[in-house]
Amino acid sequence: MAALGSPARTLRGLLRELRYLNAATGRPYRDTAAYRYLVKAFRAHRVTSEKLCRAQHELHFQAATYLCLLRSIRQHVALHQEFHGKGERSVEESAGLVGLQLPHQPGGKGWEP
């Protein structure tokens, strides 16, 4: 993972992923225990004194790691739904998935002029 960015950006990203997760249920994401926990934890570690600095960095690192996990899972599911096989594909369908076209022969295989 590269640079962490700001804690506010990480919190916004986590809340965005919560919205994606709760879109299927129809419940507002603000009614979930995860939302309440995240907001409470980030508010508790908002203080910038030197004594709480290490705990704030640890919370931010764990939150950024969890955000990466949630995004990766969502993207994996989207890719899986798009490319998951529905049985055996024909050669034409497989070529179309990667943007290729097969050459066309006028009389089929073994055609001679």
Curated annotation (Swiss-Prot):
Pfam family, any one: Complex1_LYR_2
Disordered: annotated span: 94-113
Any single GO BP term: motor behavior
Transmembrane segments: none
Cell location: Mitochondrion
Its job: Plays a role in the assembly/stability of the mitochondrial membrane ATP synthase (F(1)F(0) ATP synthase or Complex V).
Subunit structure, as described in the record: Interacts with ATPAF2.
Name of the protein: Protein FMC1 homolog
Naturally occurring in which organism (per UniProt): Rattus norvegicus
Recorded name of the encoding gene: Fmc1
